[in-house]
Amino acid sequence: MGDQVQFARMNGLGNKILVVDMRGRKDRVTPQAAIALNADPATEFDQIMAIHDPKSAGTDAWIDIVNSDGSMAQACGNGTRCVVQALAAETGRKAFLFHTVAGLLEAKEHDNGTISVDMGKPRFGWDQIPLAEEFHDTRRIELQIGPIDAPVLHSPSVASMGNPHAIFWVENDVWSYELDRFGPLLENHPIFPERANISIARIRSRQEMDLRTWERGAGLTLACGSAACAAAVNGARTGRTERMVTVNVPGGPLKIEWRERDDHVIMTGPAEWEWSGTVDPVTGIFARNEPESGDNGARAL
């Protein structure tokens, strides 16, 4: 085996996360390593959260986010909660400030074990999302799947939560749509020059919605935190919901608040530790640690 680092297999409401400790190193998890890890059923994942030494004063870490296809992501709310749980177990602290390519992320662990992440302000400008064409109102853009006179999905609300999202509002059960079929087509639609996360959302009340997501670079997942935030924000700005909602993703509920005083989006939910090991961040070759007697719950990396 080559040069190994510590990593943990975790999940945020079923969103499969590998938290990799790259502190003290100058290199990064390679796309080849990500693809190799995703090809093994033991380490198949949705996102890698690679923890690096901080690049700016006052922050606790720089985090690289890698999708299962080896591409880089700008945001992963569920993965951020997993990082918080691992670092809280390591340090005994409750609050953290991370830096990512999308900006700063504040996060804290609550006494009940849930974790809140400040995902920052949503962006609605067509060139901020970004879109390939100018739209003055991104609450509803011209995009559809299916026949012109009877589209299956149409007129999504779009926004950026550090990464681009399109939310299609539907009347039927979110499970009745072939998202595994439509997702790749919409993710790679020319209107999205950086590709996009594609979600279908059904409103249950002004305080609750159901959501399924095809994640850019990862495919169908049980949970996508940034998509839940994008859906909640778009629900509020289109008049469908209040600014505080429960978003039911396949893995369970997330609490999302679009805070009025500063427009920041706060996501709250759980994280779960599964197992740990060592991995070569260049090749993806890994070894699983033997569990200790009575080993359960969150542990330090």
UniProtKB/Swiss-Prot annotation:
EC assignment: 5.1.1.7
One BP annotation, GO: lysine biosynthetic process via diaminopimelate
Location of this chain's protein in the cell: Cytoplasm
One of the record's GO molecular function terms: diaminopimelate epimerase activity
Residues with site note (Could be important to modulate the pK values of the two catalytic cysteine residues): 165, 215
Catalytic activity: (2S,6S)-2,6-diaminopimelate = meso-2,6-diaminopimelate
Keywords: Amino-acid biosynthesis, Cytoplasm, Isomerase, Lysine biosynthesis
Active site residues per record: 76 (proton donor), 224 (proton acceptor)
Entries under PROSITE patterns matching the protein: DAP_EPIMERASE
Pathway given in the UniProt record: Amino-acid biosynthesis; L-lysine biosynthesis via DAP pathway; DL-2,6-diaminopimelate from LL-2,6-diaminopimelate: step 1/1
Database matches in InterPro entries: DAP_epimerase_AS, DAP_epimerase_DapF
Highest taxon in the source lineage: Bacteria
Chain residues that bind substrate: 15, 47, 67, 77-78, 163, 197, 215-216, 225-226
Primary subcellular site in the record, as a coarse category: cytoplasm
Any Pfam family matching the protein: DAP_epimerase
Any one of the GO CC terms: cytosol
Subunit structure: Homodimer.
Similarity field: Belongs to the diaminopimelate epimerase family.
Function: Catalyzes the stereoinversion of LL-2,6-diaminopimelate (L,L-DAP) to meso-diaminopimelate (meso-DAP), a precursor of L-lysine and an essential component of the bacterial peptidoglycan.
Protein name in the entry: Diaminopimelate epimerase
Organism: Rhizobium meliloti (strain 1021)
